[in-house]
Design a protein with these regions (language model features):
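Flexible, glycine-/basic-rich loop-and-beta segments that form/coincide
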Residues: 1-42
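C-terminal target-recognition/interaction regions appended to catalytic cores
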Residues: 33-226
């Protein structure tokens, strides 16, 4: 019987003898700010990457695509704006009296400094952006799922959400694959393309990770499909 794989990252990091898990803010904070109802969804990188995961996500991509957002009705905007960080629709459910018993997992606003909730697309909604009063864009969901920016999703925004949120995260799939290879052959393969850690900070990368630079030749171990 194969041994259980050893954890490499956790929310509590050094307390458990692991690297600290990547937070949602470390995954998406370098993406361009986008307004409600953005339909084109193609942007230049207008910020420098501050964390290793952002550096890895940008490798091989000259711009940001699939960064589209939905138009929200005034009623939906009222709901979104009423949800504080780390909470969900339970904060307003008595007011709107909907899905009171059957579904209470929607309208969740992610906390910035912990790993993201599982990305989902259901009933026309996904998680709320930590700071902005809108749902996450498909590209933000893709970052959370560990799709690099060069991976472009085709179809409508709704189809993009469905593709991304129903997918097995690529880095998770790679970790499974590497462990299966280890069990079958004994070969050790590091599934982590970068030593991602919440201890990373902008001092490590500022000034040398602008993806528009021709000198940006960071290593990458994940190419899709694989």
């Amino acid at each position: 019987m194969p041994e259980k794989p050893q954890a490499t990252h956790s929310e509590f990091g050094e307390v458990l003898g692991t690297e600290k898990a990547i937070t949602i803010w470390q995954a998406i904070s370098d993406l361009p700010q986008v307004g409600i109802g953005e339909k084109v969804g193609i942007f230049d990188y207008d910020k420098l990457a501050e964390f290793a995961y952002q550096v890895w996500s940008r490798e091989g991509s000259k711009n940001v695509e699939n960064h589209t957002t939905q138009n929200h009705s005034q009623r939906v905007l009222e709901k979104i704006s009423s949800v504080p960080m780390g909470e969900g629709m339970k904060v307003f459910i008595d007011k709107y009296e909907e899905n009171k018993v059957t579904y209470c997992g929607g309208y969740r606003r992610a906390k910035k400094h912990i790993p993201s909730y599982t990305v989902y697309w259901t009933r026309g909604m996904t998680s709320i952006h930590p700071e902005e009063n809108r749902f996450l864009s498909p590209r933000e969901c893709a970052r959370i799922q560990s799709f690099p920016d060069y991976f472009i999703f085709k179809g409508t925004t709704i189809e993009n959400y469905t593709q991304i949120c129903n997918a097995v995260p690529p880095l998770l799939a790679k970790a499974f694959g590497c462990y299966i290879i280890k069990v079958l052959t004994g070969a050790e393969i590091n599934p982590i393309p970068w030593q991602f850690s919440s201890r990373d900070n902008h001092q490590n990368y500022r000034g040398k990770v602008d993806s528009k630079s021709e000198d940006n030749n960071f290593p990458i171990q994940l190419k899709l499909p694989f």
